């Protein structure tokens, strides 16, 4: 998601000004008294990224009239958790690239990548305790527990061709939807928004997070390395079989199992068989999984009183879907 496109979707100038302040705060909070740790901990911050989760926190912060500094700190807290989890993910996956640069575990080593991830997670908790209060600290801790559960389940099913879409949904709910939901909830809470608005935007974000991950998994199979910042089809190479692959497995189990085995063994180059997972039939079935979450996310958004925020939330859903597969038929905006 390019920043220019996001700016068109979120035409609220103060949010982008706050995002600049958030970036400065992110650097401040991730700094250590040890320059070496600071360099490693800020490596992925410097590499860029969409900052989607803190943007959601800032957007949710517009639902109330709370302290702007607290709203920014809410965004920093969720981004620190996201960044810390990326450091750990790259060690788990033995990744070589992240955000278009050499991954931290390869630039330094796995031990330092784990320690830097731990440091960012600790700083998130410290910031939340100082700025946001006990309820927010508990929410962040609970969210990270869900993230770990999702990641554990993903590792459990690595290279496993016998698990199905139900397991996949549990994985992405833990790994992705939980933190996007918390981003919205934390931002709304920090703004002193009323409880109804907190609930509505949290529900929107939960389903948006599922949409986000499914569309990202489609992109992994249909986009190029320059766009992704990592090799196309990287999930398959790492033994992570996402929704399109699981659908293909269900339709032609023996054929797809052999293809995946041959790719894993190096007998077949992935790009020669990737069309088995990103053709129109597979994408159309993936779209059916999106449909329920699009409807639930948009129903939640429609309950938000602020019309400008409501329309931005609807447009964010549409953008995520359109960017992954341009000819998906999208629901009409109310």
Regions found by a protein language model. Give the residues of each.
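Flexible, glycine/charged-enriched surface loops at secondary-structure junctions
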Residues: 304-312
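Acidic, proline/serine/threonine- and glycine-rich low-complexity intrinsically disordered segments
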Residues: 322-324
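Mobile late-domain/C-terminal helix-loop "cap" segments
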Residues: 256-301
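Hydrophobic, well-ordered secondary-structure elements that form the walls
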Residues: 245, 297, 313
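Short, charged, low-complexity loops and linkers
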Residues: 2-8, 102-104, 160-167, 272-280
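Mg2+-dependent prenyl diphosphate-binding active-site environment of isoprenoid biosynthetic enzymes
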Residues: 16-21, 27-257, 264, 292, ...
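Conserved small/polar residues in nucleotide/adenosyl-binding loops
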Residues: 326-332
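N-terminal amphipathic/basic leader segments beginning at the initiator methionine
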Residues: 2-25
């Amino acid at each position: 998601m390019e920043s220019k496109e996001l700016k068109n979707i979120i035409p609220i100038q103060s949010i982008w000004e706050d995002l600049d302040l958030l970036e400065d705060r992110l650097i401040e909070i991730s700094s250590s008294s040890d320059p070496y740790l600071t360099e490693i901990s800020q490596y992925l911050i410097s590499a860029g990224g969409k900052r989607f989760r803190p943007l959601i926190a800032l957007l949710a912060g517009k639902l109330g009239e709370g302290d702007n500094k607290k709203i920014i700190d809410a965004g920093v807290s969720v981004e620190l958790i996201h960044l810390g989890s990326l450091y750990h993910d790259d060690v788990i996956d033995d990744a070589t690239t992240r955000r278009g640069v050499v991954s931290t575990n390869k630039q330094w080593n796995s031990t330092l990548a784990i320690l830097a991830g731990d440091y960012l997670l600790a700083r998130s908790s410290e910031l939340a305790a100082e700025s946001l209060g006990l309820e927010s600290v508990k929410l962040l801790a609970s969210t990270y527990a869900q993230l770990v559960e999702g990641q554990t389940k993903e590792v459990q099913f690595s290279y496993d061709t016998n698990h199905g879409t139900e397991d996949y949904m549990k994985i992405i709910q833990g790994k992705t939807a939980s933190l996007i939901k918390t981003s919205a909830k934390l931002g709304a809470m920090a703004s002193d928004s009323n409880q109804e608005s907190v609930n509505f935007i949290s529900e929107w974000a939960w389903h948006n997070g599922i949409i986000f991950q499914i569309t990202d998994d489609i992109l992994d199979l249909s986009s190029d390395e320059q766009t992704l910042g990592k090799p196309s089809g990287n999930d398959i190479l790492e033994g992570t079989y996402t929704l399109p692959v699981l659908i293909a497995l269900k339709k032609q189990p023996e054929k797809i199992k052999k293809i995946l085995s041959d790719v894993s063994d190096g007998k077949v180059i992935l790009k020669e068989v990737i069309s088995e997972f990103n053709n129109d039939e597979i994408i159309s079935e993936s779209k059916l999984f999106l449909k329920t979450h699009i409807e639930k996310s948009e129903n939640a958004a429609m309950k938000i009183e602020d019309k400008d925020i409501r329309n931005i939330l609807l447009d964010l859903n549409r953008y995520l879907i359109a960017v992954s597969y341009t000819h998906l038929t999208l629901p009409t905006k109310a």
